[in-house]
């Protein structure tokens, strides 16, 4: 296969389809989503058979249990896909909305209209459910998309792509609006991320090594985040019960997510009260604690252990594991300075009953999501009321934070006049 020609052809077809998608009616887009949902229900066994072949090959390669779990399309996974498609269909269609419409002294009206981005390239790893999630959001937001899934899920993704194409055709929409790259050749990724004539934005969903490669090689703009080094700062005016709940949930609800707390900052004035019960809670849940000298002194006196001395590298690390770095700080200023220096601009939280300190934290912490008295685990499109998300961005331009339908659109100015000319 000539990868360069193959990818160029996908791009050309996607660009053509994007024009039809931009003018597609809400009814047609919703009909396509419903048709795909019904096709998944109808062909569930065929999907599971294709997926079983992918899973068997993954096991032959010796891939670990966690990877196999992400790859597997269980009955519950298929049900979740169907529910997700219908949920996206139920969301308000942002395309064509005109906001901020106002008259100018010249007599013209000026507003902003929400429009699709165009063609979105999505690169992801082992989860075949992303094929459906990404296709649904791109379809509803009026975009065409090129999906490049993981090589281990080729048969699963091909089977899902067939059903998506059927759904688009049934609704009178171009099948080329959703295309799945049908090769495991890594050169396909290299071509996709440089096709500036055909692709408007790349959304990567994967591990750090993938994102780093794309940052270095991509010429197409990206919506991305590299790390999720999330912090909780417990202020000396915090409510102890709230602090225990937030700190427990932020770390132990799930260890492998990008919105999990990786560093706990504790004000020196509350350390002796908070750390002993919190340390015992983490110990009971087998969380390894990497601590500075001040935190060690408090925890050791309370009989909490074992403890590991933190190094500077710990403040930079996204563990994605039952490991937590703990540092005692002088107060709010030191906490904000630490977060802005070591953090990844993803999600950070303060626990405090002091309104002024809470507002300072919200203003001064330079992150995509900043929270007061709430777990960092809430940084999620569904929890934020977006309905669904295609990913999370910690960049400052275009989309920031969880990216839902509106994040896959942009605004253009529209002017309504009555024959006016500029004086």
Curated annotation (Swiss-Prot):
Subcellular localization(s) per the UniProt record: Cytoplasm
Database matches in NCBIfam families: PRK00197.1, proA
Name of the molecule in the record: Gamma-glutamyl phosphate reductase
Family: Belongs to the gamma-glutamyl phosphate reductase family.
Gene: proA
Major localisation: cytoplasm
Organism field: Burkholderia ambifaria (strain ATCC BAA-244 / DSM 16087 / CCUG 44356 / LMG 19182 / AMMD) (Burkholderia cepacia (strain AMMD))
HAMAP family per the UniProt record, alphabetical: ProA (MF_00412)
EC number: 1.2.1.41
Catalyses which reaction(s): L-glutamate 5-semialdehyde + phosphate + NADP(+) = L-glutamyl 5-phosphate + NADPH + H(+)
Keyword terms of this UniProt record: Amino-acid biosynthesis, Cytoplasm, NADP, Oxidoreductase, Proline biosynthesis
